[in-house]
């Protein structure tokens, strides 16, 4: 289907968005592409796993533990569709289409596709899982050109939602209140179904789906407070809300963003932007995730260097990927590059760090579930900040009847690399937008219908130089926007050897482009020191009273050694210590920081790290010595103490 025509999920964006993610053709040849290929080979083409996911809808296993096995199919389908939109891998598409066909066949006579029986539905994670079924189908329709098949899938979705509408709505009408249809998070998880409901309205034009979306928004996301009103009023931080579950809350705001595209209520856009800005200010760490208390907002911007938080589960991959998708959507609708600055931090640090490149096995899960068949999974679930290890458990692990298992973070991971490929280059109303700098070739359509090809030659993110060669048959003037990252203080830009100004945000170059024109960009990648933000003590909402669906306040005190930490940023990369680099990450070091806050690192011509890494550097100490670090995403991949690591270094 054409991406932005009428009766597509994206059609409303024509009236509201600044940028458009129309992928004509692109092929990269770097870190992102190799990661995507690994994920595709290790996970997305596994037809047997797709069959297992569908089987859950026939056997209803989630009634036993009010579980979320029903989310796995749609979560992974959405990510796989993002990946396919870049790779155009026919073998992958065939696997996905067969799985969609299989799932449609699992629909019951009431129109339901659920891992819960009718008698036990609307409990636990039922609506949350149905959300993902709908999203998976909606995103498949985007990549499919088979009109007859797509019509069958859309009809399947209509039946699913028609059943929901018949049961869920205003209590005064004898229906069930959506925020009460779960035993968790005061209804945030169930309310996040808003996103696919709005998209289904755009696909069909049926007012009853928009009416249902109106109802969901009016309920406010929680049964104890209206989360959208809290964000609109902007009087408190998300970590102070009555429920602080980062993944589910952000998912609700993604849904509100889709809803804004239809209703165009500026109050809702204000709420969305307020929420995003609060997260960036208060709950966004150096590796681009949120939450030092597993997956809760907890003022992690200031807490991230605390060495003793009591639980190694932090910086959940589900949170990282959901934030990436949120930032991508915010960039589309606002045109603000700060959201891509945040996206890039997540991508090159927290996200790529979670990719299981070394095929490690989660020993924590193996000890807890000795009966399960443990195999390497494509993604880790949590990421360390102070000295710690990867592999601290499989987030959202659910066993299957045959002894296999899966988890929430494993399923969502593919969406991260897929949305990165979408975000890399966009179309604006006046030209094209270059957001990410990956070696390769991008053909991007202009709104006029003409195409422009950008050939990008670079070793970014480990090198500062980016060369972009323009190839176009278009005889019109158009604009090329190049993101100038916030960390690059002194960016230099040349067009055919002539200097142009490089303001913060986007560098706008508007001209009549000729094939062979060259843009040379040199970013300021000096390594800089980052220090913890002192906070003393505070009250958080990060204690869950399980069984009664309550969160209660806790007193949080800054650890005495928190301020004895330092983090080092090189371009978009955070640098990490690792036990295999010839020292213990538990030992204190004394980093030599210059008066201007920068660090004179040495980048060796030949890497010496005993593991594959994207970047390696020597860090000077105050006593004239050096110690070796690598990029954060490459460190810690054994998931054991042998590869213990830290992005926040303990200092003397």
Regions from the language model: what does each represent?
Residues 2-90, 123-147, 187-203, 207, ...:
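Aromatic (Trp/Tyr) and acidic
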Residues 48, 76, 90-127, 283-294, ...:
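Helix-terminus loop motifs that line ligand-binding clefts
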Residues 87, 107, 144, 164, ...:
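Alpha-helical junction/boundary sensor with strong preference for TPR arrays
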Residues 114-122, 177-181, 232-237, 294-299:
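Short linear capping/connector segments at secondary-structure termini
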Residues 118-127, 134, 150-188:
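Asp-box/WD-like beta-propeller blade repeats and closely related beta-sheet repeat scaffolds
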Residues 213, 272, 340-463, 502, ...:
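C-terminal beta-rich recognition modules with glycine/proline-rich loops and embedded aromatic residues
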Residues 481-507, 512, 521-524, 528:
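Accessory beta-strand-rich segments of carbohydrate-active enzymes
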């Amino acid at each position: 289907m054409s991406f932005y025509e009428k009766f597509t999920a994206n059609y409303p964006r024509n009236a509201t968005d600044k940028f458009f993610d129309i992928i004509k053709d692109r092929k990269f040849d770097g870190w992102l592409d190799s990661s995507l290929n690994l994920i595709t080979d290790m996970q997305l083409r596994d037809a047997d796993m797709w069959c297992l996911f569908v089987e859950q809808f026939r056997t209803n296993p989630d009634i036993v533990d009010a579980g979320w096995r029903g989310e796995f199919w749609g979560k992974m389908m959405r990510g796989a569709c993002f990946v396919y939109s870049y790779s155009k891998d026919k073998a992958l598409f065939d696997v996905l289409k067969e799985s969609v066909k299989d799932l449609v066949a699992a629909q019951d006579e009431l129109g339901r596709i659920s891992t819960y029986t009718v008698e036990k539905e609307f409990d636990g994670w039922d609506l949350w899982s149905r959300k993902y079924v709908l999203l998976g189908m909606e995103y498949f329709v985007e990549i499919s050109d088979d009109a007859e098949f797509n019509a069958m899938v859309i009809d399947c979705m209509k039946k699913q939602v028609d059943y929901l509408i018949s049961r869920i709505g205003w209590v005064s009408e004898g229906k069930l209140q959506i925020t009460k249809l779960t035993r968790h998070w005061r209804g945030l998880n169930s309310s996040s179904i808003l996103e696919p409901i709005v998209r289904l309205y755009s696909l069909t034009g049926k007012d009853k789906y928009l009416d249902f979306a109106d109802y969901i928004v009016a309920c406010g996301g929680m049964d104890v407070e209206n989360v959208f009103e809290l964000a609109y009023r902007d009087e408190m931080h998300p970590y102070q809300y009555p429920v602080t579950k980062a993944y589910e809350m952000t998912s609700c705001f993604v849904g509100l963003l889709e809803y804004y595209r239809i209703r165009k209520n500026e109050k809702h856009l204000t709420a969305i932007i307020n929420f995003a800005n609060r997260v960036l200010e208060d709950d966004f760490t150096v590796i681009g995730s949120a939450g030092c208390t597993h997956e809760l907002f907890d003022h992690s911007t200031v807490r991230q260097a605390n060495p003793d938080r009591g639980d190694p589960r932090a910086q959940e991959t589900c949170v990282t990927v959901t934030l990436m998708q949120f930032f991508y959507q915010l960039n589309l609708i606002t045109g603000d590059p700060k959201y891509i600055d945040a996206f890039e931090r997540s991508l090159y640090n927290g996200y790529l760090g979670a990719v299981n490149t070394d095929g490690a096995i989660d020993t924590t899960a193996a000890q807890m579930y000795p009966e399960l068949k443990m195999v390497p999974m494509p993604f880790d679930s949590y990421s360390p900040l102070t000295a710690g290890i990867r592999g601290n458990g499989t987030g959202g692990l659910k066993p299957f009847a045959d002894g296999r298992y899966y988890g929430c973070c494993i399923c969502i991971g593919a969406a991260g690399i897929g949305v990165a490929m979408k975000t890399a280059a966009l179309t604006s109303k006046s030209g094209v937008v270059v957001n990410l700098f990956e070696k390769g070739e991008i053909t991007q359509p202009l709104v006029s219908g003409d195409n422009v090809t950008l050939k990008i030659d670079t070793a970014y993110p480990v090198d500062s130089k980016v060369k972009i060669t323009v190839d176009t048959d278009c005889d019109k003037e158009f604009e090329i926007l190049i993101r100038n990252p916030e960390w690059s203080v002194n960016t230099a830009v040349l067009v055919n050897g002539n200097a142009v100004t490089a303001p913060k945000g986007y560098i706008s170059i508007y001209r009549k482009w000729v094939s062979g024109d060259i843009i040379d960009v040199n970013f300021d990648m000096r390594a800089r020191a980052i220090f913890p933000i002192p906070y003393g003590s505070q009250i958080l909402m990060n204690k869950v009273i399980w069984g009664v669906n309550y969160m209660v306040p806790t007193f949080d005190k800054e650890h005495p050694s928190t301020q004895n930490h330092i983090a080092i940023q090189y371009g978009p990369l955070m640098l990490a210590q690792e036990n295999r680099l010839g020292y213990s990450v538990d030992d204190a070091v004394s980093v030599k920081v210059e008066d201007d806050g920068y660090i004179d690192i040495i980048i060796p011509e030949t890497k010496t790290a005993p593991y594959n890494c994207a970047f390696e550097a020597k860090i000077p100490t105050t006593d004239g010595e050096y110690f070796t670090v690598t990029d954060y995403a490459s460190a810690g991949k054994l998931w054991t103490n042998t590869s213990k690591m830290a992005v926040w270094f303990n200092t003397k």
